[in-house]
């Protein structure tokens, strides 16, 4: 019995120290598997205003993290994860926005982060062009069937 109580106590302590559970999703706006130029996600440029991006670009996807507590350290940690996800998708930068959800504030998780993954036109390779063309053709077919 004593061993079971200690085990339950340890489980409660471990669970209390676990990371924040968030709700994430990714909405593709272009093909997967684009060429990766940024291998160190810490060097991923982060913009908050479109006017700050000084070269032609297109969004390749949007990544959202919902139900975050209003805690700077947790938000910074999630931004690091967003940058890693953007680099893995072939993005050259992200446009990051933060939203406050009054309804979710009652549960203590009012923050949503939304990041557009940006691909610079100058960074598109020939292989990327083929993937973009194929993606566009598939989108036409999908839209024709709806």
Q: Where does each model-flagged region fall?
A:
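Short, cationic low-complexity segments
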Residues: 131-146
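Bacterial Sec signal peptide processing site at the extreme N-terminus
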Residues: 14-34
């Amino acid at each position: 019995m004593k061993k079971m109580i200690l085990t339950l106590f340890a489980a409660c302590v471990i669970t209390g120290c676990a990371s924040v559970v968030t709700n994430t999703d990714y909405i593709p706006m272009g093909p997967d598997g684009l060429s990766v130029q940024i291998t160190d996600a810490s060097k991923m440029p982060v913009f908050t205003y479109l006017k700050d991006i000084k070269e032609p670009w297109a969004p390749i996807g949007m990544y959202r993290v919902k139900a975050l507590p209003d805690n700077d350290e947790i938000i910074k940690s999630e931004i690091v994860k967003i940058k890693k996800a953007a680099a893995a998708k072939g993005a050259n930068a992200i446009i990051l926005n933060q939203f406050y959800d009054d309804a979710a504030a009652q549960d203590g998780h009012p923050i949503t982060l939304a990041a557009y993954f940006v691909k610079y036109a100058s960074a598109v390779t020939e292989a990327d062009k083929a993937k973009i063309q194929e993606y566009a053709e598939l989108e036409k077919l999908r839209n024709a069937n709806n």
